[in-house]
């Protein structure tokens, strides 16, 4: 089963790395890039936020073990661990015609709530079109993983959770999202359903083949 999320990263994303060059007009950090020089959202960042949200949903519906089956778990010995059935790769940010901005930031003392003197910094953030791609392996738990993932992606599409750091400063939120679910049938036919979020509030569902009913 494949699930895709297409949307606008309408506020700057927040996974940064230190710059290798210095200067007054050079930011202290910028978004992570891949070997091709493209800005990316690491798969580990996507997995991290989804793992946390799916864990909350699992607790809310009073179930256990669903997240472990999706993401896997470790053990003291290699034989005791188990890999999950949810695969998530890095996502390229298509920011060719979108925002590429340097922001001035300040450090806040978490104990006093005041500004730390001399800790002003500059970071380069980007925004643009994104397409998250998820593959769920058919191991007997694919439908349960898909259902839990769709609930978490719904929260992302509605602006309840963000990707990366910077939640408090409005970074990493997705808008105008379309969630696409593709399921392979027994005879090799692909069934498809679309969930469209307009302005993070108005929702349209296209599911003529009852794909959602099979996994929810």
Predicted feature locations:
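Small/polar/charged residue-enriched interaction surfaces, especially the RNA/DNA-contacting tracks
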Residues: 1-216
């Amino acid at each position: 089963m494949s699930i895709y999320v297409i949307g606008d990263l309408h506020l700057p994303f927040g996974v940064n790395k230190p710059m290798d060059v210095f200067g007054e007009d050079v930011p202290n950090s910028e978004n992570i890039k891949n070997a091709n020089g493209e800005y990316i959202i690491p798969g580990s960042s996507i997995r991290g936020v989804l793992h946390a949200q799916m864990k909350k949903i699992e607790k809310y519906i009073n179930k256990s073990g669903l997240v472990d089956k999706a993401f896997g778990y470790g053990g003291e010995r290699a034989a005791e661990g188990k890999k999950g059935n949810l695969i998530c790769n890095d996502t390229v940010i298509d920011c060719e015609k979108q925002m590429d901005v340097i922001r001035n930031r300040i450090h806040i003392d978490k104990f006093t709530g005041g500004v730390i003197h001399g800790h002003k910094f500059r970071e380069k953030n980007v925004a643009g079109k994104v397409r998250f791609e998820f593959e769920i392996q058919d191991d007997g738990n694919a439908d349960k993983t898909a259902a839990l993932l769709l609930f978490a992606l719904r929260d992302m599409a509605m602006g309840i959770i963000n990707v990366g750091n910077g939640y408090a400063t409005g970074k990493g939120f997705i808008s105008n999202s379309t969630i696409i679910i593709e399921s392979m049938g027994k005879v090799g036919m692909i069934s498809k359903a679309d969930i469209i979020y307009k302005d993070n509030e108005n929702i349209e569902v296209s599911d003529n083949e009852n794909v959602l009913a099979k996994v929810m």
